């Protein structure tokens, strides 16, 4: 029998607003760089570092050991915290290399959810699949981020199909890329009906976040080149018709993952 004291009751609102999640991926998919972006946009840091920083360039916060700095990889799990939208997030950056995977396996027993990072050019890689299976054993909710869309990447539908087939999980798009490779100019936020357009001079920065009124909004034609817009609208129409809608319970059960691109 659990007796709830007045102190426990007083702490409950603070407990309810806390979220702990890990970031998992195959080596070099961009996991630690994404960690820096979470910290940056969460207000925990003022400038994002680089995994392979040279000279006086700022390095990433999670790769703080000398070995990590020298090799440009994560060799141990690192926990960081930030507050965003009245929630307190505990973020754990985990090692991707199989040599250090035991630390990752232990970490995954202590988190609420995981963000799975996929390289847009390589798709589902071996270590990603192993870490996914660890999450699956715990029926853990998984969010997917397909990274490096500004490089030569595979077809968006092919990436989604591979995730569904290799990992046996339903995938529902939460965003959709506008162009790929050199033509990549940002994403359409399908959940909030917004265009997230990148700065052409610095692809790491969102230059514009524009609210639109559906896919027939005239602003689309003003902001997106005609050749990209036509293909984008065709893909969005297919995605909405063919792919499952987001179901919160399926996500919480670990049988469906929403996917973002960037």
Give the residues covered by each predicted segment.
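P-loop NTPase switch module centered on the Walker A-proximal segment
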Residues: 2-118, 124, 173, 215-217
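P-loop NTPase catalytic nucleotide-binding module
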Residues: 1-29, 120-262
């Amino acid at each position: 029998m659990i007796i709830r004291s007045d102190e426990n009751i007083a702490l409950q609102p603070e407990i309810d607003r806390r979220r702990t999640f890990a970031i998992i991926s195959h080596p070099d998919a961009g996991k630690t760089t994404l960690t820096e972006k979470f910290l940056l946009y969460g207000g925990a840091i003022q400038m994002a570092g680089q995994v392979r920083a040279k000279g006086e360039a700022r390095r990433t916060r999670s790769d703080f050991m000398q070995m990590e700095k020298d090799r440009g990889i994560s060799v141990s799990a690192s926990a960081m915290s930030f507050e965003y939208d009245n929630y307190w997030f505990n973020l754990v950056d985990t090692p991707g290399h199989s040599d250090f995977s035991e630390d990752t396996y232990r970490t995954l027993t202590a988190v609420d959810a995981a963000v799975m990072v996929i390289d847009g050019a390589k798709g589902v890689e071996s270590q990603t699949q192993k870490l996914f299976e660890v999450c699956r054993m715990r029926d853990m909710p998984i969010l997917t981020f397909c990274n490096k869309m500004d490089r030569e990447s595979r077809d968006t539908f092919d990436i989604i199909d591979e995730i569904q087939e290799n990992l046996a999980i339903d995938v529902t798009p939460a965003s959709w890329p506008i162009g790929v490779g050199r033509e990549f100019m940002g994403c359409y936020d399908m959940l909030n009906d917004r265009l997230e357009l990148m700065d052409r001079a610095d692809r790491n920065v969102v230059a514009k976040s524009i609210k639109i009124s559906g896919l027939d909004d005239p602003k689309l034609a003003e902001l997106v080149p005609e050749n990209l817009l036509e293909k984008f609208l065709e893909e969005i129409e297919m995605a909405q018709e063919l792919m499952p809608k987001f179901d919160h319970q399926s996500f919480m059960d670990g049988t469906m993952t929403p996917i973002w691109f960037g």
